[in-house]
Structure formats: structure tokens, C-alpha cells
Amino acid sequence: MLSFCDYFWSEDLVSGLDVLFDRLYHGCEQCDLFIQLFASRMQFEVSHGRQLFGIEAGMDNLKAVQEDEDEGVTVSRALRGILQEMSQEGTHHLTIASNIESLVLQPFSKWCIEHRERIQYSEKTLLTNVNNFRKSKKYVGKLEKEYFNKCRQLEEFKRTHFNEDELANAMKSLKIQNKYEEDVAREKDHRFFNRIAGIDFDYKTMKETLQLLLTKLPKTDYKLPLISYSLSNTNNGGEITKFLLDHMSLKDIDQAETFGQDLLNLGFLKYCNGVGNTFVNSKKFQYQWKNTAYMFANVPMPGSEEPTTGESLISRFNNWDGSSAKEIIQSKIGNDQGAAKIQAPHISDNERTLFRMMDALAASDKKYYQECFKMDALRCSVEELLIDHLSFMEKCESDRLNAIKKATLDFCSTLGNKISSLRLCIDKMLTLENDIDPTADLLQLLVKYKTGSFKPQAIVYNNYYNPGSFQNFGVDLETRCRLDKKVVPLIISSIFSYMDKIYPDLPNDKVRTSIWTDSVKLSLTHQLRNLLNKQQFHNEGEIFDILSTSKLEPSTIASVVKIYLLELPDPLIPNDVSDILRVLYLDYPPLVETALQNSTSSPENQQDDDNEEGFDTKRIRGLYTTLSSLSKPHIATLDAITTHFYRLIKILKMGENGNEVADEFTVSISQEFANCIIQSKITDDNEIGFKIFYDLLTHKKQIFHELKRQNSKN
């Protein structure tokens, strides 16, 4: 059955959702109209019932009729009886109104309000996440542009300022400079830093001490009095003093307080309670760990993704608030630098500029690389969220239609249970109620308002020098095959080989075929995709190891093939080729359904069979002639896919009811892979993809024999 999850996708994600929610809100308006209908009928029943009750009160001289009735006058008795029946009829109408309100109007109105809230919640959640994703995608595009600009600037600088020999010498100088900086940093770790609480600390020991305080001592947020502002990463004086006594060889509390005071003086701590620069061992005195403490210790700030690295101590301490700490450290580092400059290698101005540009490029590349894969993970999570909410909205819409059906039935029952004279009208209304078909309405919504099939847009990290070398999914087929040094992507061929390996262990043919046709949760597919995406594989064994250790179901492994093909920038059969094939299949349509019929042909059908065979011959000839224009990786990948299923179909035919099972699987796998080989159009439900894949399976030998023959000629 058609599903919301398959037909409300669009390239920007938003336009498909806009169409869907427009129809869902239209459904809410339908519910409001039903509420108006029920309320109007209730008001009519109330008004009509009261009018029937008021007939007796509006008549004159009823007292005389009462006297005549006491005297046994038959006419008066008839009048009294008619009035009583009218009053009884009024009671029935008021009862109907009461039942409509309590049994239909109130519960249905309450349900409609909740239904609208569910739609609003999903709309807000999805649009917020999709819009945030689109903003982040623009940010990644900006990073990509900056990265490529830096690459071009670097290459231009190399071209204009260096020849090949000078560039080689510059690279050697870079290695010498890096080694020199590492040696200086290593030597600096063991130089004297400061005397704290009577203990001499070198740089290394001071870093380790701060790392202990910043990572092992639990931090809290401190809310400043009178204003609604909180400071993060704080401890009170008592906590710091106790931690120092527990973890360091300090004599007593006084020495621990002195240690805390020195941390305050050096600018690692800041007093939070007001103005002052005194450290006190008390729970009432709150202190915040400053950013410079995290920078000095190379510890990531809470909430940041990576530690602060790569800056010299001078640049780090230039931003310190503690002026005394500045003077101490600047003087010591200045002396260290003076000593280091004596042994520093000579670097020209052009080389220095080159190294600076290379550092800037490396930083830009790293940031672009990280954000690219972070965006791809975000894209996967957004798709999973969309799948979940589309399924939820499909259930909500189905529930809405069923709720209208039930409310209509309750409404008709309320009328029919009371007044038999309305039976004919009620029967007609029941007929109308019976004509309500939620499934057909849901199908009509999908067919008329669908925006596109599921086509994930992978976020690709475009490295300037090695495009496609850092991920496997979303890279165009020719690039992937060139990097794999194969004509078929290594992931595709390896998964098919792995499936061939596990087929014998599966209990029966039904399980083997259902692997490729069962629905798989998108999050599980993305989980395995993530394991296979970043690593560059050299042989099938590496992929086999991941597939074996993942302990995922075979159907999940099979789904990765589909997601790989869907994420290709260009489908296996590109759009220009598919347009030609659409015309071909329009002129020579296949009769796929005849493959499922096992009846023998009668003499009167012989002429039709001959016509069909002629159509098939022309269509297949046109198919392999058109496909011959594809590149070698595209043809080889199509061949690998169809070969795998062709062999599986041959195995199925050898089992019990083999031909029937094989024919059913051929149809179902053609439907499953239709969107994987060709990009569908909204109007045709990708019937062309189904027909092409079906022909590739049923005429495989002829088609690929001709394709290989034509390629060998070329």
C-alpha cells in the first residue's frame, strides 16, 4: 500500500511537507464542517422539540376540553391524545438533541482539537528541524567555499613565488621548523613556572595539576544574587580546599588556602560574590574557573567539542585578566624564546607566508571535514525524524477519517434509535456513511498530492586534492570506481558476495527473498551506513569484517545497497537516458502481468502472442542500444545487481512451486529496485523503473551480452 513515507519528499524537504500539512489542515477543516453539521442538527432538534411542547400551551379554552373529556366526549379525548403524542414527540426530539451533544458532538469536538494539536506539533517539530538543517547546510557550503578559496590561494602563491626546487626546500624547512617547535615545547615543559604555596612547579606539573582540578573536581552553576544570570564552572572555597588536601601532599588547611590564593593571583580563578581577590576556605565564597585555566591545561571547555590546542603560551596568556600572571609568564616565556631563537632555523619571508597559509588551509580543511560529516549525520537524523513523523501523520490522517466515519455512524444511530418515521432518511444517511472509505481517501490524497519519492541528498565532503577519498556514500559512481580500482563499487560487490555467503545458512527460500523486500527501519540502515562510510576499503575482507561484527539482520545489510544507490548524485540510468527509455516503453509496452499467469495459450490467442513477441524483440533491442551509451561503471554495476538476482531466481526455480515463487520475486524485486536505478517522476510512480528492471532480469543474458559486445567493439 502507498505510504506517506514514500511520497512526500522533495529536494528541499520543505515543499513536500508544505503540501502534506496543507492537506492535513484541509482535513481539520472537514472535521469542523462535520461539527457544524452535528451542532446545527442538534439546534434544530432542540427548537423543534420545544415547539412541539409549546403547542398545548398556545391553545385557548383547553379547560373546556378537559371538562368535555371528563364527561366522556370522544372528540375531546382524541384531541387530548393527539396533544399528548405531540408532547411525547417533542420529548423524543429533545432526547435526540441531548444524545447528539453527549454521544457525538462533545467527544468528536474534543478529538478534533487534539488531532489539530498533533498536526501542529509535528509541523512545528519537522519544519524547525528541517529549517535548522538547511541553515546548517548553507554553513557547510560556506565552509566549502572558504576551503576551496584557501586551496586556490595557496596554489597561486606556490606558483608565483616558488619553483619546484624552492618548493621542495621549503617543505624540508617546514619539517625542520616543526621539529624545532616540538623540541622547544618539550624542553619548556620542564622549566620553572612559579612557586605556589611554597612548592616549585614547572610547566608540565602545573598543567597536570590544573587538569586534575578541572576534570576531577565536580563543577556547578552559580546564580548571582538579585539578577537572573548564572556563572558556569564554579566551586566554592571549601570544595577547592578539600580537593587540594585530598589529592595533593599539602601539610594543612593554611597551605591549601595559600595554594588557592596563588591560583587566584595567577588568573586561573575568579571571585564570583563581588569585588575582591582573596581566597577563603568557605562554602559562602564562590570561585569560577577562568577560560585561561582550561587553555593552559589543554582541557576542553565544558560544552566545546575539542580541546584548545596549537597556540603558543604567549598568545594564550595575552588574554589573561590577571596582570601579575601576565608579567610572570611573559617574562619567563620571553627568556625562553630568546634562547630558542639562537637555535631556530632560518626561514625566508616567502616560506613563513607559505607555512602560515598552509596552517590556515589545514585549519579550514579540518573544520570543513568535521562539519561535513556532522551535517551528514544530522541529515540522517532529520530523515529518520521525517520518516517517524510521516508515519505518525499517516496514522493520524487514517484515524481522522475513521473518526469521521464513527461520528457519522453514531449520529445516524442517535436519530434512528428514536424516530421510526425517519427510517428512510436514516437509511439513506447510513448508505452515505457506508460509502465513506478511509483507505480510498488516503490513497486519493497520496496519488493527487504526492511531491516525490524518497531520494536522500548525501552531504559530500569535497576535498580539493582528493575528491571522494574520505567517504563512500554520495560520491558519483565513476569517482568511486576509480578510487576502488574496480568497475563496480567495492561496497556493492562485497555486500552481494556476503549475501551469497549467508544464503545457505538461511532456513528457506521465503526468508532469502524477504531479505530484499522487507521494510527496514531507516535508523538501522544509517547505523550500518555510518560504519561503512568514512573508511576507505582495499578488499572485500575488510567489509566482511564490519558486516560480521555489526550483528545486524541480513535485511538491514541488504538495505544498505538500496541506500547507496539512492544517494548517488546521478542514478544508474541518468535522466537523459531514462527520457529516451520512457518513449521506447510507451511505443512497445511490456505485458509484465502475463509472466504471473501459468495458463497455456489457446489458438485464438496465438496472434496476440506473436504481436507481444514482436514488441518484446523491438523493446529489448532498443533497451540495450540505449543503455550502450552509459559509462562502463554504470553498465558494470547494473550487470552486478541483475546477476546477483538472476542467480537467486534460478535457485528459486529449483524449489517447490519454483516457477511461481520465482515470478513473484521477480516482480517484487523489480518494484523494490525501481527507484534505485532510475529517478522517478511524480506522475508515473516509477513504472518505467519497474519495467526496465523486470526486463533486465528476464532478458539478462541477451541484454548484457549485446552490451559487452558493443563495448568490445568500441
From Swiss-Prot:
It holds the Pfam family FCH. It comes from the Eukaryota. One of its GO terms (molecular function) is GTPase activator activity. The record marks 517 as: Arginine finger. Keywords: Coiled coil, GTPase activation. PROSITE patterns: DEP, F_BAR, RHOGAP. One of its GO terms (biological process) is cytoskeleton organization. SMART domains: DEP, FCH, RhoGAP. GO terms for cellular component: cell division site; cellular bud neck; cellular bud tip; cytoplasm; division septum. The keyword Coiled coil applies. Residues 475-704 form the Rho-GAP domain. Interacts with CDC42 and RHO5. Present with 1750 molecules/cell in log phase SD medium. Acts in signal transduction. Activates CDC42 and RHO5. This is Rho-GTPase-activating protein RGD2. It comes from Saccharomyces cerevisiae (strain ATCC 204508 / S288c) (Baker's yeast). The lineage of its organism: Eukaryota, Fungi, Dikarya, Ascomycota, Saccharomycotina. The gene is RGD2.
